[in-house]
């Protein structure tokens, strides 16, 4: 039984690619066999973990490198801010599109969620891609972790797209090359954890009653804003400067 998580590093051991005083970058590649076994998409997963003393600039540089490596050459980038703008723990993508500087190279889109608009995020993104024809789509979303200490501190980049809502069991149509016809890279941060995970971390037994209860930290407003600031700067550094 695997934990409920969006973080590949919590399902398979990776290799440490780079380590600084306050950050650690871990790379994981899931092949077809791994993907089937773990229920995740094939591809490369880059995780940059930061401790409490990490400098934002240090994080930005490491994430920008990961974005450039997974995206390849991109003259036009569509940044898609996924999530519900009315829920703090789910508004990471929306905040990133608010903070990022758009222009000739970077375009931003906030499709919101089906429960708010009545339209699938995929349909909105597909329609915009058909018009502006980006070289790469970068999808930004809040993630779920199976480890409390990674909340707001572990940034994950995936080379093969994202399934919106997967971390909380609300799977939507996947955003990837196969569905959109364009390269899709995702970046996100875990901002929620299941209560059952916390109980198990504290030595308790798995409780089915807790399997649907999702918990966020009390300082979630600060965390989501800081993470959005870091990601928006990393995107600008990767694709503009």
Region roles according to the model:
Residues 109-137, 142-143:
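Catalytic-core regions of hydrolytic enzymes
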Residues 109-110, 139-241:
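A structural signal for small-residue-enriched, beta-sheet-centric alpha/beta enzyme cores
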Residues 1-12, 55, 65, 69, ...:
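N-terminal charge/polar-biased segments
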Residues 1-43:
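N-terminal amphipathic/basic leader segments beginning at the initiator methionine
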Residues 80, 84-108:
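Glycine-rich phosphate/diphosphate-binding loop of Rossmann-like nucleotide-binding domains
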Residues 43, 58, 62, 91, ...:
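Conserved active-site and cofactor/substrate-binding residues in soluble primary-metabolism enzymes
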Residues 87-91, 119, 146:
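Short glycine/serine/threonine-rich phosphate/pyrophosphate-binding segments
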Residues 34-71:
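An N-terminal, well-structured beta->alpha segment
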């Amino acid at each position: 039984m695997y934990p409920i998580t969006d973080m590949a590093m919590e399902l398979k051991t990776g290799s440490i690619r780079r380590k600084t005083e306050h950050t650690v970058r871990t790379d994981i590649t899931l092949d077809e066999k791994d993907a089937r076994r773990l229920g995740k998409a094939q591809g490369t997963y880059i995780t940059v973990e930061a401790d409490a003393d990490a400098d934002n600039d240090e994080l930005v540089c490491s994430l920008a490198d990961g974005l450039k490596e997974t995206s390849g050459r991109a003259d036009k980038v569509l940044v898609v801010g996924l999530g519900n703008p009315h829920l703090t723990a789910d508004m990471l993508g929306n905040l990133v599109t608010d903070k990022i500087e758009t222009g000739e190279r970077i375009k931003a889109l906030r499709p919101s969620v089906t429960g708010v608009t009545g339209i699938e995020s995929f349909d909105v993104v597909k329609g915009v891609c058909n018009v502006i024809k980006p070289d790469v789509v970068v999808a930004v979303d809040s993630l779920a972790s199976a480890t409390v200490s990674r909340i707001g501190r572990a940034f994950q980049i995936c080379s093969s797209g994202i399934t919106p809502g997967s971390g909380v069991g609300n799977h939507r149509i996947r955003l990837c090359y196969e569905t959109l016809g364009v390269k899709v890279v995702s970046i996100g941060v875990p901002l929620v954890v299941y209560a059952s995970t916390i109980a198990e971390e504290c030595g308790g037994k798995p409780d089915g009653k807790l399997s649907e209860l999702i918990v966020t930290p009390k300082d979630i407003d600060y965390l989501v804003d800081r993470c959005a600031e870091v990601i928006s700067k990393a995107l600008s550094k990767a694709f503009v400067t």
